[in-house]
Amino acid sequence: MNTNKNTVFDLKSKFKPSGDQPQAIEKIVKGFKEDKFKSQVLVGATGTGKTFTMANIIQSLNCKTLVLAHNKTLAAQLYSEFKEMFPDNKVEYFVSAFDFYQPEAFLPKTNTYIEKNSQSNNDIEMLNLSALNSLIERDDVIVVASVAAIYASSPPDDFFKNRVAYKKNQVIPIKQVQYELVNLNYQRNDVDVTHGRFSVKGDLMEIGPGFTDEFNYRISFFGDEIEEIAKIDPLTKQVITKLDEIVLPGAEVYLANRDTLEESLKRIKDELTETHKNFLKQNKLIEAQRILERTNHDIESFKEFGFCPGIENYSRHLELRAQGQTPYTIFDYFDKDWLLIVDESHMMVPQIRGMYNTDRSRKETLVEYGFRLPSALDNRPLNFNEFLSKTDKKLYVSATPNEWEIEESQQITEQIIRPTGLVDPIIEIRPTQDQILDIEQELRKQIANKERTFITVMTIRLAEELTEYLRNKNIKVAYLHNELKTIERFKILNNLRKGIYDVVIGINLLREGLDVPEVSKVLILDADKPGFFRSDKSLIQIIGRASRNVNGKVIMYADTITEAMDKAIKETERRRNIQIEFNKKHNITPKTVIKPIALDLSKNDADINIDELISKNKKSKEKIDRTVKKLREEMLAAAKNQEYERAAYIRDIIMELEANKK
């Protein structure tokens, strides 16, 4: 692994830290560098620029960083922002590579075995491989990850060993190179060389590195000697640059170590013998027969291919780990001195806590009924204590941190002042009687002022009825529900910003991507009802949706003031008073956030009706593959022309198509 410590994180931005950012950056950096704090919390109000603060902290601490986000969409958003701020450093993306995942399970009550069923996303697998490869090779790396980070990954030593290097003037037969690539799970394809594939035409070999689709390698042979190595454009085949040496990791994140495979198989056989014997002692003949047949079938696959379906269930033996030993994860690719940032920690920490028990409960049933060896229990995510032990620098970031993060941390830093001077919105409580008529009147005022509105409700029925009512009143309204695909959601929010809609109604308006500056009013129905969506933390998050506009206001419809409402209102007033005082002291006039509306893709060739496309091609996987190939070429061309929004849009279309392949 790379041990060079001359890391330099170079933050590029036209902005300088302002508002509360300078004091927050200084305080947190000092806490880690001088005070040697292990855990800190950044309490950042919505719109105060928490991501920019994180970027400045990374630059000041100058160490590898892992940023955890609680879902793929938020992770993608952070990845995009960090990539823009650190163009000369390595910013990577590490999330679950499954578009669809149904884990293996057994339901004893109905005697139903559910086979693992999944749809992998090749592009995300490539990005995950790129993240591990960068951590092995470089120190100036930021990885943005989802909860996938706590799940088992290839051991760093194995990943490092499963690489091949080729040098100019090296004497090696072309067949030997092919053999080595196949051993690393590269596939020969002389027609379409994408990542993880290679082609051979005469004395020319083209390789799509497993970790990127931005370029391919071309190796020219003269007899058994490598005459030239070049990095080439995958589409045009033009030479980007000539190289003296290349290093290729495996085509997949997880590869069995062939050097230790014999020992691994012996361990599997020994455990099988013991498990089979135990089932027979208990007179569990069906389970005994089942574990014998299933495991022997997997052993034969290992012998022939070095691989088997469900290979991850044998990870303890393949990695020669002891029973109960902590599995290897992406955390093990970081050096001792690195930073962990847990973004939206109020959501992320509970998610991490719950993963271990959920996984173990399912696998214990599989083991009990002979579907898996007991060692399958060691193919697992980290438990919470293991997660906490992985680094001595943890920063929890949230507008509403939980009590656990507060108690765990040695220092709490508030970031309340916004660089724009915007203050938290005014909150008004109104009775529920005649609330629908009142909402209609409020929306008429908003429309007259050319400002937008969010309405959050508690039930699907109310959301649908209110949407229908407002449409009948000729109000341009959209309902943001959880069945919408990412692209459709993106379009609705874009259309709200452009005025195609005046109001958006939703149940969970806490999700990422709802920072819309044009929204000056948020209406909260059933504000006094108990439940997660009306807790004090949730209410503060909802209130924050109106904090991007100078005219921000929140109306709560309620007949009583609950404890949660009272806490949220008092905290908002506290922050608002601090912000107003700061503005007076520094003579700052608040300004609505100016945020460019994303590229209008409806006028672009890339604007494709996904449902229609899938419907047309659902009987032909080949047709979808051809369409994906064409779109991938468009995506690469758009990225090359720096049309990043269009490229991202096409990427989302590709992901939707591949997820729906039969």
Curated annotation (Swiss-Prot):
InterPro entries: Helicase/UvrB_N (IPR006935), Helicase_ATP-bd (IPR014001), Helicase_C-like (IPR001650), P-loop_NTPase (IPR027417), UVR_dom (IPR001943), UVR_dom_sf (IPR036876), UvrB (IPR004807), UvrB_inter (IPR041471). Residues 438-597 form the Helicase C-terminal domain. One of its GO terms (molecular function) is excinuclease ABC activity. A motif (Beta-hairpin) lies at residues 97-120. Transmembrane segments: none annotated. Pfam families: Helicase_C (PF00271), ResIII (PF04851), UVR (PF02151), UvrB (PF12344), UvrB_inter (PF17757). Residues 31-419 form the Helicase ATP-binding domain. Residues 625-660 form the UVR domain. It comes from the Bacteria. ATP binds at G44, A45, T46, G47, T48, G49, K50, T51. Keywords: ATP-binding, Cytoplasm, DNA damage, DNA excision, DNA repair, Excision nuclease, Nucleotide-binding, SOS response. It is found in: Cytoplasm. One of its GO terms (cellular component) is excinuclease repair complex. GO terms for biological process: nucleotide-excision repair; SOS response. The UvrABC repair system catalyzes the recognition and processing of DNA lesions. A damage recognition complex composed of 2 UvrA and 2 UvrB subunits scans DNA for abnormalities. Upon binding of the UvrA(2)B(2) complex to a putative damaged site, the DNA wraps around one UvrB monomer. DNA wrap is dependent on ATP binding by UvrB and probably causes local melting of the DNA helix, facilitating insertion of UvrB beta-hairpin between the DNA strands. Then UvrB probes one DNA strand for the presence of a lesion. Belongs to the UvrB family. The beta-hairpin motif is involved in DNA binding. Forms a heterotetramer with UvrA during the search for lesions. Interacts with UvrC in an incision complex. This is UvrABC system protein B. It comes from Malacoplasma penetrans (strain HF-2) (Mycoplasma penetrans). The gene is uvrB.
